[in-house]
Amino acid sequence: LTGAAVVALSLAGCGGGASAPAVPATPKDAKVLEALNLYRGKLSPLTLDSGLNKAAEEVAKIILSNKPLGESKDAFAEAHKAILGYKNAELYQPIGLSMNEVSEGTYKAAPRYVCQDDAKLMGEQLMAQTGDPALEQLKSPLVKLVGIHVFEYGSATYWVAVVAEGGKTA
């Protein structure tokens, strides 16, 4: 059997309605996951989830749209759809998203964290951050799952993440 066949067979035995843990799509995704787990310290490592990856991708699309966000249209509608059914996912803010007020009631989404090749360095930079309530969420032992999306914005590579306490139930 090939390595992929062994993985497929082992995942097939997982059963239940929950989605199987995702494998990092790129080496950069793997580095971000490693950095987040370094930031968490002694807490159990986060598991990458493909459904939450979709939610993180939708958050990145909001940043990439580069449009002012007002109260009229829910820019986060697709991200909200992607987290439906995840345990308490709606209670957590996307990590790596900065909302800057451009005028009263109007905001512009911007990326917050640069993706780097060194996971240890990224983890140390996260530990040095202060005043980011979204990042502080990772200190909760209740948070178990994460979705990550790495993207290009301007001349740099950034990442965003979405977390939940548990997977979708059947």
Predicted regions and their residues:
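Bacterial signal peptide processing site
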Residues: 15-17
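C-terminal motif of bacterial Sec signal peptides marking the signal peptidase cleavage site
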Residues: 10-13
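Second-shell loop/turn segments in exported
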Residues: 19-26, 41-49, 65-67, 99, ...
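Sec-dependent N-terminal signal peptides
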Residues: 1-6
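Short, well-ordered surface patches within globular domains
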Residues: 23-91
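A well-ordered secondary-structure block
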Residues: 77-169
